[in-house]
Amino acid sequence: MKHEVVTLQRSQLAQAAEMLVWAFQSDQIYCELFPQSDARHKALVTMFGGVVGYALHYGEVLTTPEIRGGACWLPPGQAKVTLWRIARTGFGLVRGIVGFSQEARKRFMAGVMHTETAHKRLITVPHWYLWLLGVAPDRQGHGYGSALLQPILARADQDGVPCYLETQTERNVVFYRRRGFEVAETGLMPGVDLPVWHMVRTPHG
């Protein structure tokens, strides 16, 4: 089934953040950081709102008309998340992290530093960065993820630009490999001791 893909509007940011919480609330990394479901929801809705707001300002957020999935992309030249850019988008991402418990914040930031260091080391040329891809649980397995990736993958191929991402599950590794990504490095994410895969997609001619 072919799914329509549209650009998320800023007025839809809160709805998109709630959808992403629904998509990721059972992921092991967030269950490790926030064992209590109420605290997890509160932390994630603020954090994902910050991610979406940042990507709307500096990149592209693709979704479906009914907002059942979302892909947050940062383009070549903007793929590095910086504090200055976070400030320009209203500190939403910082507010989310500050709202974590001290222990969760320490563990989360250890993971962030690890992924940022690997990102800089593994891909040094201009590239698209898939910061976040989430699909509502009741739509997973029905082609939404592929549809949300396709517009930017096609543009990257046309422009001869690679793409980069990180993922924390083997199931996602299989999914991304089918879309042309290859594992560049694997490791354990500090703070949570969970696996992380760093993946790169070279442009397809």
Locate each region found by the language model.
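A short beta-loop-alpha structural element at the N-terminal edge
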Residues: 4-18, 22
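Conserved acyl-donor/pantetheine-binding loop and adjacent beta-alpha core of acyl/acetyltransferases
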Residues: 72-134, 140, 190
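Conserved acetyl-CoA-binding loop-helix of GNAT-fold acetyltransferases
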Residues: 132-135, 141-154, 178
